[in-house]
Amino acid sequence: MTKIIVYSCVTNKYDNVEKTLLSSVGFAEDGVKFVLFTDSLANGAKSDIYKAKGSAITWELRPLLWRHSLCKRRTARFHKINSHMLNLDAECTVWVDGSQKLKPISLSRQLVTPLASRYSLASFKHPERICIYQEMQACRKLKKDNPLLMRNQINAYKTEGYPPYNGLVETACVFRKQTQQIAEFNKLWWDQISRYSFRDQLSFNYVAWKLKLEYGKIPGCRTSSQFFEFIPHGKSSP
């Protein structure tokens, strides 16, 4: 079994991943694989490979395993959240958003091993907000999703007794062990996305609280990390 699979998902080349994630110089390691789920495979191919010039890593391109009929974001979220359903035969997975470039460091030694020694789940700590109630207000202000849907979601959590100021993650990177406990976490997380907003940061902390699952904090944040370089959507690095 592969030790670690780093993976992502892109639809309609939304993140322009050939200039971001796929162009990563990266760091080749035994036991670490790289997988991208995409709808851009030619002629219904079951798989392909991609290696950028100057890169140390090779990406395995796989077709999407599920597609929402109307919302490409929910299509991507399915692959992001359901790591246990993607035929990722590995001890651990690391989800990375398509807006990130992998820096030339050992993800196994510097990211995964320290986390795996203590946690089955980890993500970035949000750099600006400290709970899902604040996140919902920010998402409403920025018109990130249907405001009624988000309000109903947060009200449901409040009715259950979910506390304020209970932490907030930034899910540009999500580390997970491939365990039954994490499969249960994924299932409940996806259930929230299916019922409510596709903004997965609104439900991650609720699900961890509901399942009494302690999660770790990945050092840094989406835009400032020792592991990744952030490239805004639609832009490429110099």
Where do the language-model regions lie?
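N-terminal anchoring/stem segment of glycosyltransferases
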Residues: 1-76, 86-89, 195-198, 210-212, ...
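Nuclease catalytic cores that cleave nucleic-acid phosphodiester bonds
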Residues: 60, 88, 103, 128-129, ...
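A conserved donor-nucleotide-binding helix/loop in the catalytic core
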Residues: 67-96, 107-108, 203
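Short, high-confidence coil segments that cap the C-terminus of an alpha-helix
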Residues: 90, 117-120, 213
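Cell wall/extracellular polymer interaction/catalysis modules
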Residues: 96, 129-143, 147-148, 227
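The conserved acidic donor/metal-binding loop of glycosyltransferases
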Residues: 97-101
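Conserved donor-nucleotide/metal-binding helix-loop-beta segment in metal-dependent transferases, i.e.
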Residues: 102-140
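Catalytic core and acceptor-binding pocket of nucleotide-sugar-dependent glycosyltransferases
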Residues: 144-238
